[in-house]
Amino acid sequence: MTDDQAKQVLHRYLRSAREALLWKLDGLSEYDARRPLTPTGTNLLGLVKHVAGVSSEYFGSVFERPFPETLPWIGEGAEENAHLWVTAEESREDIVGLYQRVADHADATIEALDLDSPGIVPWWRKSGRGDVTLQQILVHMVAELHRHAGHADIVREQIDATTGLYASGSNLPDHDAEWWAAYRARIEEAAQTFQGR
C-alpha cells in the first residue's frame, strides 16, 4: 500500500465516523439532542460540539493551518467542559453547521499534506509527544471520532431505542422489540448470579 492509499483509507474511516456521529441527531427534539444521559453529562449535541472543537485544533493549528473561526469554548480561559454541552443560546443548526465547516477544513488539510508532514501538538509537549505527523493525527482522530460515535450509539439508544452504525441501516440483527426484551432478560439473569460479588 502506498502512502497515498494509506491516507485515503484513514480519511475514509474518519469520514465514516463523522457520519456515524452526526446521524444520531436525526429526528430528535431539541431537548433530546441536548439532554444529559450519563452522570457526567454526556449528550448527543455536546459530542458533536466537542468533536468539532478538537478537530478544528488537530487539523488546524497543529499543522499551522488555523481554523478561521474562534471557538470560545476551546483554549485558554475557556469554561471547564464548555466544549461538551450546548448552551441555550447555541442552536443545533449552529453546532451542526460548525461541525461541517470544521470537517471541510480538516479535509482540506488532509488533502494538502502528506502522511509524514510534521505538526506540533502543544498540549502533548509535556508528555514528550508534541512532535507529530499527519499520519499520527489521522489515527488519533479516527480513534477519537469512533469512540465518541460509540458514546452516541448508547445515548441515542437510551432516548428512543434507535440503534445502528448508519441511518441507512442497522448493523444489528433484525429482531422485534419482544425478541430484544427476552435477550436482555437472559443477560440480566446471567448477571444476577454474580450480584453482590
Protein language model annotation of sequence segments:
Residues 1-6:
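Short, contiguous pre-domain boundary segments
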Residues 7, 11-25, 30-80, 121-197:
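Short, contiguous alpha-helical
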Residues 79-136:
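A contiguous binding-surface segment within folded domains or other stable secondary-structure elements
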